[in-house]
Amino acid sequence: MVLIRVLANLLILQLSYAQKSSELVIGGDECNINEHRFLVALYDYWSQSFLCGGTLINEEWVLTAKHCDRTHILIYVGVHDRSVQFDKEQRRFPKEKYFFDCSNNFTKWDKDIMLIRLNKPVSYSEHIAPLSLPSSPPIVGSVCRAMGWGQTTSPQETLPDVPHCANINLLDYEVCRTAHPQFRLPATSRTLCAGVLEGGIDTCNRDSGGPLICNGQFQGIVFWGPDPCAQPDKPGLYTKVFDHLDWIQSIIAGEKTVNCPP
């Protein structure tokens, strides 16, 4: 189940790389219906087309990837099978959208993150619950869980109705720098490198914005990966949630001055 990154040739920050805006999990399996209560689905309002995943972090806020942004977005909570008619109580709109503009020690590769305030709070239920922000940084070598409604085949596009889940490995960032020399990734970064070096398992197009969960903690946001997905020795990049905590928490707290991480 390859979480196929949004390889729709979206050029973010003037970088010519394939983003996982709508990636699926390749080499994975259908997620248990109770495994993804925090996973939300983002749709384009006008075309009604599925865009990305996102993560509910409390009853009023969703965290996703910046490149998933559109002028008009619909957000659905408590979704498993996208072919089933959504209930209007599952639908939300962005009340506010926040983008990461901090410049200190952050490169353009580190800013693919968007915080969305919903137009009204959601009610938790059997199929809706938040995923807490991380309390500690991720550990290289961890086995992480990725999930989404992204492509399950690549380069052919096969989009599933239900989310797929897969386990991938958290790798040293230098592995991604070596694997993708053409992009001249910075020597240090606030992004995570993750994948299965043997290939066959990956996130893919339309998985973008969804969570990477390591040791039970929300550590990454699906961001970028090679096209086709799931190639051997070609891991992907994930926005590192832990390094954006100050920014996230200051916005949610309603502080007038947003805190930029050191």
Swiss-Prot record:
The answer, when asked if Signal is one of the entry's keywords, is: yes
Catalytic reaction annotation: Selective cleavage of Arg-|-Xaa bond in fibrinogen, to form fibrin, and release fibrinopeptide A. The specificity of further degradation of fibrinogen varies with species origin of the enzyme
One biological process term from GO is: regulation of blood pressure
Q: Where is the Peptidase S1 domain?
A: 25-253
Q: Where is the active site?
A: H67, D112, S208
**What EC number(s) does its UniProt record assign?**
3.4.21.74
- What is this protein's tissue specificity according to the annotation? Expressed by the venom gland.
Attached carbohydrates are found at: N105
List keywords of the entry alphabetically.
Blood coagulation cascade activating toxin, Disulfide bond, Glycoprotein, Hemostasis impairing toxin, Hydrolase, Hypotensive agent, Protease, Secreted, Serine protease, Signal, Toxin
Residue numbers covered by the propeptide annotation in the UniProt entry: 19-24
> Which residue windows are transmembrane per the record?
none
For this chain, the annotated S-S bridges are C31-C165, C52-C68, C102-C260, C144-C214, C176-C193, C204-C229
Indicate yes or no for the key word Zinc: no
Q: Name one Pfam family in it.
A: Trypsin
* Gene Ontology cellular component terms for the protein in this record: extracellular region; secretory granule
Q: Which domain of life is it from?
A: Eukaryota
Give the location in the cell: Secreted
Query: Main role?
Result: Thrombin-like snake venom protein that release fibrinopeptide A from fibrinogen (FGA). Shows both kinin-releasing and coagulant activities.
Query: Under which name does UniProt file this protein?
Result: Thrombin-like enzyme crotalase
